[in-house]
């Protein structure tokens, strides 16, 4: 099918790039090759063209280099696994997928490796160790819970594929908010910038609303950029396709609606931010850092989508050899 055109998306937040971007690019293959996460030449080329180093450098512009390297490797792990969930035979095997996820959660919670563990498990052991050298266990437990939510979303998508279901709009939005993984990458902004927001903020209803809106903004922009590839491959998990299918409108009209939804969400984010008011200077500093991380991810993700070739190619992956 023809490449769907991507109209302008509203984003008032400035582009920023971490000063270590060039060094990170040089480093970017080191970790994934050490753990043999790229199964073949095709996966190698796909990884290089995806430019995850640019996403990390754009989404975490103020991070120190060691934290940036670890975060880049987390992003690499998630995206490589995400391809297995979406493009390999696992995409229609929710039970198998769930078994993998349960084991990954055990690893993240401290379980030791066995002879049956996969390359992905071995990589997670390394990520856990390196992360906990620089982060508190309290923060890491939050991070694990966000990854668990991401895993849940991936399994729900696989269930729909196995049953041949096109989810209704409300169901799709619920699943997408999990499968996009934004809560986990926002938590990494705390890690990269060496702070942890206090519980009084993390549990505040307006902060939760900001997180939800940020999740939607990133989800809908990604759906716009990935629409051509996903629709051509027969994947129904895209807001453009869901609107096209259930509202019986053209794909072009559906794109216009998603762009409109995205832009309205950006305005909503700014409006909610303006309503925030806390009672101590310390809390104001912490929430400002966290909101800055949201802005960096929204802009960084958008810049990366334009720069990366991740969503430009249509291909089917062979299942990674789990040895």
From Swiss-Prot:
GO BP, sorted A to Z: sesquiterpene biosynthetic process
The organism sits in which domain of life? Answer: Bacteria
Question: Which prosthetic group or cofactor does it need?
Answer: Mg(2+)
Where, by residue number, does Mg(2+) 2 bind? 82, 86
DDXXD motif, short sequence motif: residues: 82-86
Provide any one GO MF term from the record.
germacrene-A synthase activity
Which EC number(s) are documented for this chain? Answer: 4.2.3.90
Residues binding Mg(2+) 1: 82, 86
Q: How is the cofactor bound?
A: Binds 3 Mg(2+) ions per subunit.
The record's note on its domains: The Asp-Asp-Xaa-Xaa-Asp/Glu (DDXXD/E) motif is important for the catalytic activity, presumably through binding to Mg(2+).
Entries under PANTHER family matching the protein: BETA-PINACENE SYNTHASE-RELATED, TERPENE SYNTHASE
Name under which the protein is recorded: Germacrene A synthase
* Organism the protein comes from: Nostoc punctiforme (strain ATCC 29133 / PCC 73102)
Q: Which taxonomic lineage does the organism of this UniProt entry have?
A: Bacteria, Bacillati, Cyanobacteriota, Cyanophyceae, Nostocales
């Amino acid at each position: 099918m023809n490449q769907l055109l991507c109209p302008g998306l509203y984003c008032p937040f400035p582009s920023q790039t971490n000063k270590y971007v060039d060094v990170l690019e040089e480093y970017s293959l080191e970790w994934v090759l050490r753990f043999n996460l790229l199964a073949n030449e095709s996966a190698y080329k796909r990884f290089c063209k995806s430019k995850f180093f640019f996403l990390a450098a754009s989404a975490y512009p103020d991070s120190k280099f060691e934290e940036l390297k670890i975060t880049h490797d987390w992003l690499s792990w998630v995206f490589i696994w995400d391809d297995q969930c979406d493009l390999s035979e696992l995409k229609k095997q929710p039970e198998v997928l769930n078994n993998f996820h349960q084991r990954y959660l055990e690893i993240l919670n401290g379980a030791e490796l066995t002879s049956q563990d996969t390359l992905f498990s071995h990589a997670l052991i390394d990520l856990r160790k390196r992360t906990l050298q620089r982060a508190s266990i309290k923060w890491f437990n939050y991070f694990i819970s966000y990854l668990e939510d991401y895993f849940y979303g991936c399994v729900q998508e696989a269930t729909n594929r196995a049953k041949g279901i096109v989810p209704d709009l409300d169901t799709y939005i619920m699943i997408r908010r999990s499968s996009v993984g934004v809560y986990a990458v926002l938590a990494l902004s705390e890690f990269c910038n060496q702070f942890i927001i206090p519980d009084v903020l993390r549990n505040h209803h307006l902060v939760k609303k900001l997180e939800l809106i940020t999740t939607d903004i990133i989800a809908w922009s990604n759906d716009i950029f990935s629409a051509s590839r996903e629709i051509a491959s027969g994947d129904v998990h895209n807001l453009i396709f869901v609107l096209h299918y259930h509202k019986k409108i053209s794909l072009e009209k559906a794109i216009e609606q998603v762009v409109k939804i995205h832009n309205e969400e950006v305005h909503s984010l700014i409006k909610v931010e303006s309503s925030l008011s806390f009672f101590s200077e310390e809390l104001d500093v912490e929430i400002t850092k966290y909101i800055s991380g949201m802005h960096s991810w929204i802009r960084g993700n958008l810049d990366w989508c334009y720069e990366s070739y991740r969503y430009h190619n249509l291909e089917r992956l062979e299942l990674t050899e789990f040895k």
